[in-house]
């Protein structure tokens, strides 16, 4: 009976996240930093996620609570963040873990961020959509457009969230589709940071 209740709660959580069309998670990175901002209403307006119920990667806690949500700001070498380096592209992979303590429900939202550049410097990167440069810190809230998370993936499903922005050029949207990685799925859209 206990397993049935957990399964039912897991299905409800998955349904809420799948149907949610709000901007719930923003992801950013440089060649040395990785950050995520998750809204407390990630699970829907009726299910508030508390800061101690979310973690990044291998259990890294929220680093800051702001009006926009819970911030995770870590060096790209921590929290089990995975990195793949290609000729002019570095791809970072991680996951946002949700553990709804009072309901016994856990979930995982895969995250991905791409850094373009000819070298792996550790000081700065450029955000593609407005060419704003920054030094090892997430950009100010007014300096970039947040990326939408419109299809969340939970419980190891083979679908990654859509990080889509109208400024993403068509030639870059399918870049990772030719690369093998367990988080890449044929219908994935990739945001350019």
UniProtKB/Swiss-Prot annotation:
Q: What is its main location?
A: secreted
Sites where a glycan is attached: 64, 130, 148, 151, 165, 178
Keywords attached to this entry: Glycoprotein, Secreted, Signal
Where does the record say this protein resides?
A: Secreted
Top-rank taxon, per record: Eukaryota
Signal peptide: which range, if any? 1-22
Q: Which InterPro entries match?
A: PLAC1_fam (IPR033222)
Give any Gene Ontology cellular component.
extracellular region
UniProt record similarity statement: Belongs to the PLAC1 family.
Protein name, as recorded = Oocyte-secreted protein 3
- The coding gene here is OOSP3
């Amino acid at each position: 009976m206990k397993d049935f209740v957990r399964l039912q709660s897991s299905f409800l959580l998955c349904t809420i996240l799948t149907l949610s069309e709000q901007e719930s998670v923003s992801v950013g990175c440089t060649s040395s930093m990785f950050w995520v901002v998750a809204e407390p209403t990630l699970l829907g307006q009726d299910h508030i996620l508390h800061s101690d119920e979310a973690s990044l990667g291998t259990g890294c806690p929220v680093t800051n609570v702001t009006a926009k949500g819970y911030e995770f700001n870590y060096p790209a070498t921590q929290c089990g963040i995975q990195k793949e380096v290609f000729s002019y592209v570095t791809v970072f992979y991680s996951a946002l873990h949700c553990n709804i303590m009072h309901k016994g429900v856990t979930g995982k939202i895969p995250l991905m961020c791409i850094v373009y550049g000819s070298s792996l410097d550790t000081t700065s990167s450029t955000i593609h959509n407005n060419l704003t440069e920054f030094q090892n810190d997430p950009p100010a809230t007014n300096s970039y457009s947040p990326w939408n998370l419109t299809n969340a993936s939970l419980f190891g499903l083979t679908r990654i969230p859509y990080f889509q922005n109208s400024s993403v050029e068509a030639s870059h949207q399918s870049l990772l589709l030719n690369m093998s990685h367990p988080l890449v799925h044929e219908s994935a859209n990739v945001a350019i940071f």
